[in-house]
Amino acid sequence: MSITAGPKVTTTAALVNTDRKMNNHHSTQVLHGSGQHGMQPSGNNVLNGLANGATGLQSSASSTSTRDDSTIVGLHYKIGKKIGEGSFGVLFEGVNMINNVPVAIKFEPRKTDAPQLKDEYRTYKILSGSEGIPQAYYFGQEGLHNILVIDLLGPSLEDLFDWCGRRFSIKTVVHVAIQMITLIEELHDHDLIYRDIKPDNFLIGRPNQPDANMVHLIDFGMAKLYRDPKTKQHIPYREKKSLSGTARYMSINTHLGREQSRRDDMEALGHVFFYFLRGQLPWQGLKAANNKLKYEKIGEKKRSTNVYDLSQGLPVQFGRYLEIVRNLGFEETPDYEGYRKLLLSVLDELGQKLDGEYDWMKLNGGRGWDLAINKKPNLHGYGHPTPPNEKSKRHRNKFNQVPLAVNNLNGSNVPLQSHSPLPGGTDLTQGVSNAPQQPQQIMSQQQYQQHTQQRLDPMSYEAYKQQVQQRYAQQPQPTQQKAQKSPNNDTSQQQFSQNRQQQPQYQFQQNQPQNGKVQVADSNSEKGFFSKLGCC
């Protein structure tokens, strides 16, 4: 049984029917929105055969855009402003040029140690048609990146929580909690566990849409199969597992290195509910010498915090929920409907109803949230960025005031002289030094105009692409001496460079479906014990 707050809405499938008929390239994008009442969300090898013929993955040759316009990907998705960034890569808003439907475009470097977009795309296709799950339209390669295009949504619950003074009313928490439980139930029904429950990954819809205040779930890069889709055989219980998720919300069993299952998603939801009700959790702000000790402290604090103390001054039903899910067995099926009824009883006791009214609808004199007023606090979600910090402001001002050096014919940078040099050749842009001065190069008017034209909007795709190209160009190349020290002394520097260039393609292809079955790597195989941990 699915319970949602507010009027029932249709899925996004109808909106993209025209697009899917006209485009053979499926892709996915992340969410984001602007306006009133809304803003901004891997399984393992058991996934064999689950998405046979359903994912529509294209090879790199067929999925790479052939358009001359550098701001168009996937043949007809035009890239707009940057709206988010994080460890995964960068997120841009965009538009489907065929039907003018807004989309989100997620960029992931192809050379990343743990690519996730391909597995995330598969998960979106598995969940396609589920209420509260954005539609995935396209996945492919564009230059140095993997690209995912999905529905554009509104702000995350974390953003709305900030805008509402970092405290939700009991009524709003019940509204969102019921929807969050239903979304996780839908994921579990498709044999997947989420493993990274946090407010940042739950978004509401875009303004002026039927689902403007409906909670959606995004970002399935950490999702994993907990049972075989065909036989329904549950994964075995194991210990000494690496931590996966966000330390602030993860379950106690996850801190203890135990294999995650459905119970861990439900416990993490309980921690989010108390976060919304209390404003913060008792294990926030703990200090330690390093991250490993910090996560251990968080786990110890969770174990030592009594649920009764956590529920002080709050409806007892929230504490009861946390007690129930913490006592679930490893393979036990959660009572999703029972949890919803338990939380609905809170409204009954308060004499309130599930009427679809949320705290964020009261912002700005009852007009609701507005990005022109309510700023996105950071770029790690899927909202609009805030102005740069003081350090970046200084960098920006310096960039705007001092002409950059122009590369000479030898490829080295030389300092530039002001356009109006002072008598005696004095240049105020240079520091005072007794060392012999290098020959200075005066920038011509034409060079200055070209330099000015290169000042791109830092939120634009062109600026991001320029940064990526510069970063790759600055990567050190292996010397001939290093190549001779390699195990194969016959390998030339040219062959070594070719192997490096071919490596990303191999990494992308190695998870391609084999023998008609989808092979998905277990994200626990990543190097590093804390490689999957989020903010705590």
From Swiss-Prot:
ATP binds at I83, G84, E85, G86, S87, F88, G89, V90, L91, K106. It comes from the Eukaryota. Residues 43-65, 437-453, 463-514 have a biased composition (Low complexity). Keywords: ATP-binding, Kinase, Lipoprotein, Nucleotide-binding, Palmitate, Serine/threonine-protein kinase, Transferase. Belongs to the protein kinase superfamily. CK1 Ser/Thr protein kinase family. Casein kinase I subfamily. Casein kinases are operationally defined by their preferential utilization of acidic proteins such as caseins as substrates. This is Casein kinase I homolog RAG8. It comes from Kluyveromyces lactis (strain ATCC 8585 / CBS 2359 / DSM 70799 / NBRC 1267 / NRRL Y-1140 / WM37). The lineage of its organism: Eukaryota, Fungi, Dikarya, Ascomycota, Saccharomycotina. The gene is RAG8.
